[in-house]
């Protein structure tokens, strides 16, 4: 019998050999592109150690050059996915503890490949599409998340180091693709200073919400005609939410699942391939999905989520999401969302540390209660949180932080916008602290109670990000709204101008006018 790579008895040797071959293929591929491009990309990059083929002069941007850059990122992502897939097979056989974070990377790479493929299709038609900015920003966030998951495991070994190396290589090429795109967009009159678009006029709903989805959000349960009904007592089509999700037909249409009143002890994952899923409950506190995974319990932050929604077009209405791990469990996510154009409406999200993980892409939260302690709203999406109750609860720490925004690149169109909310809770609460170098958070037209610390915002560690972050306030009220005692950082803006504040509205920040109307959620598109 002929011996091949995949018939060798030692799986560790197979993985080592596969890794060696992938590295050589990557090196050869990079050299060929660099030679054929005649150093086209050698003069422009913020990552001088990344491939020369992923660089270009800012002054000589072309659609072809940008496509070459994205194609290189796509090739890197394919190689990284191949490594991640084979590592997961090896880990299943050996029951290695690295399985969880490599699985995270695999899921995130699948999402990245889909977004990069869309970009290639759009740009080959020479179309200017604002979705490209969101997808590149999210692809970069995915690699940062992969590296974060790997770093959280104490068993970080040579396999993890290999996966981390590929994630860093892909990060470099994605950074340069994003740099090229934003450089070109800045030359266009449609480019806005904040969210990457010019500001749009007020409208009842962001335009990315279709009229049919809008009707669904306001419809009664009887009018919904759900595709599946979940009831613990057996009166529905399924007894568990996971069973109902698995039963949904594949396709691009809207799938509605009604969750009857009750408590469902499940951990759910809606993958990127499962799009346009709508979960509808019977009301806050009536329909409850609860899990208890936590960092202290052995789960990394990404995998700790009670409910994870990665498929685009996710909608949740009238549901309570809970992580019951407790105040000493460290990171314990109740809801993680990496779904583009997602809506969470009239829900409750309850936890302690890291309650709501707004991972990536465009998101909107309305009339939702979000409760937690440390960094209880965090991530790197472009998210507007509007007309919500943000409650800082008593935990194991003396200090609480409402937000920890994770923007790692100045060209990402991401950030947290809190508008017309009530922020209340225990004493010693800060509005936020910078998780990443270019953290961006704005609180505007909201009521801040006396629990807010006079300085308003807190450092993460020393002087980290204090000059590069973007924190702002506009038109707030209540005992904690005075900016007279606020921090004196270069990146803090105590009084945003009207134009600056408009850039963080539903219309200005998440292009809500193009997609929210279809979901049916009530929203304010501009300033109040």
Could you say what each language-model-derived stretch is?
Residues 81-84, 88, 116, 120-124, ...:
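Long, hydrophobic, amphipathic alpha-helical segments used as structural scaffolds
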Residues 12-31:
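Cleavable N-terminal signal peptides of Sec/SRP-targeted secreted and luminal proteins
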